[in-house]
A protein has these predicted regions:
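A general structural signal for short secondary-structure junctions and capping/turn motifs
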Residues: 7-8, 250-251, 260-261, 298-302
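Hydrophobic side chains within well-formed alpha-helices
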Residues: 35-38, 138, 306
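Radical SAM enzyme [4Fe-4S]-AdoMet core and its adjacent flexible, acidic
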Residues: 48, 75-258, 262-264, 268, ...
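Short, acidic/turn-prone active-site loops that include or flank metal/cofactor-
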Residues: 54-56, 123-125, 328-330
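Flexible mid-to-C-terminal extensions adjoining Fe-S/redox cofactors in radical SAM and related proteins
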Residues: 267-373
Length: 373
């Protein structure tokens, strides 16, 4: 890994824009050499932290946490290890390694906190998700990591992207299954055909991007099938943004409100597009220099043709949250969303429908601990 942001730059960027919530993205952030120190530093700044991950290294990071805690309070951790062994979430050799304590006692670990979320990427049930990520077994590892995280008291969210061929009934089944596992919230967002994604798809996979990504019309058609989800599932998007996705209202883009900082600087104008100077040395300079009125869709007209099909949360969710295109009743909707009773969906999930890919032959329906009525 040659191109990584120094830890000090990461922490100073968070302080510079003073965002209440920081999403650590990648690539895969868990291979960042100082990920534990970064999470610790952001928490010391009193920020909510989301670690966006494919979950391949989650269980390893949680075992490192257990090793530290076992040294401090073995009597409390021993029963947890027993549960993890019974659930086959750690192996006997991994449990013994935990009992030996941390390899480096000075190294911080990622501990459970109500202000930190594992944000696990899941784009469908087993078969579809493994196809999208081009690797068998990834879905299964995601579920194992989620189960382990909930046993240990972590907050867990999931992030799902909807594409042209996505079956919304499948996503509904996924959300119900994840609710049964105790997942704390879900982000569901439309797949947008930004330039880098289109180039990668055509070059690496030989796929026509227009057959994969959503137009604005496609997005509304897809999400209109899911109007009830906001009341049924613990969605992390505001009700106003969900109404936008379902075609029941219009919003404008506020890309400046969820800025992206990478190794080159503050990316402008947004997570998807890079224009003008491309990257700025400071957040303030980016805010002042970018002509924000040149982007987004206003009254059905795209200010920039590349924005025509974008309805993603990083541009439009802040508009909804900040009330920038507000209507009577929006404030009350957001108050209820933030402080009202949260949905608690229950229902039996047929595990053969969930594990419908590489693990189908394992007959997961014989594992009743995965389901609660």
């Amino acid at each position: 890994m040659k191109n990584v942001m120094p830890l000090e730059d990461c922490l100073s960027a968070a302080a510079e824009c003073d965002a209440p919530m920081v999403s650590i993205c990648g690539g895969e952030p868990l291979i960042y050499p100082q990920i534990e120190a970064l999470v610790q530093g952001l928490r010391e700044q009193r920020r909510i932290v989301y670690i966006c991950t494919n979950a391949m290294f989650m269980r390893r990071k949680m075992r490192e946490y257990l090793a530290v805690e076992y040294k401090k309070r073995p009597a409390e951790i021993e029963p947890l290890l027993g549960t993890l062994l019974d659930e086959r979430l750690v192996t006997p050799s991994e449990a013994e390694q935990v009992k030996k304590g941390p390899k480096d006692a000075s190294k911080p670990v990622i501990s459970p906190s109500k202000w930190m979320y594992w944000n696990v990427h899941l784009d469908g049930l087993e078969k579809i998700h493994d196809i999208i990520v081009e690797r068998e077994g990834v879905f299964q590892e995601c579920i194992l990591a989620i189960r382990m995280a909930k046993i240990l008291g972590y907050q867990v969210a999931t992030n799902t992207t909807v594409y042209r061929e996505t079956d919304m009934k499948e996503i509904e089944t996924l959300l119900l299954y994840l609710a049964n596992l105790g997942v704390d919230g879900h982000t569901v967002t439309p797949g947008y055909d930004y330039d880098a994604a289109k180039t990668d798809m055509a070059k690496r996979l030989g796929i026509d991007p227009s057959a994969f990504f959503l137009t604005r019309r496609n997005t509304i058609e897809k999400f209109s099938q899911a109007k009830s989800w906001g009341k049924r599932f613990r969605l992390l998007g505001t009700p106003v943004y969900w109404e936008f996705l379902t075609g029941d209202r219009d919003l404008t883009c506020s890309a400046w409100a969820i800025p992206t900082r990478n190794i080159m600087g503050w990316k402008a104008p947004c997570y998807f597009l890079t224009d003008g100077k491309g990257h700025y040395p400071s957040y303030a300079e980016m805010l002042a220099d970018v002509d924000w009125d040149s982007y987004g869709v206003v009254d059905g007209v795209a200010k920039d043709p590349r924005c025509e099909n974008c309805m993603t949360h990083c541009g439009y969710e802040p508009t909804a949250a900040l009330g920038l295109k507000g209507k009577p009743g929006d404030t009350w909707k957001n108050i209820l969303f933030n402080f009202g009773a949260r949905p608690n969906p229950k229902g039996k999930v047929v595990l053969s429908e969930v594990f419908n890919g590489v693990s189908a032959a394992a007959k997961p329906e014989k594992n009743p601990e995965l389901v609660r009525e």
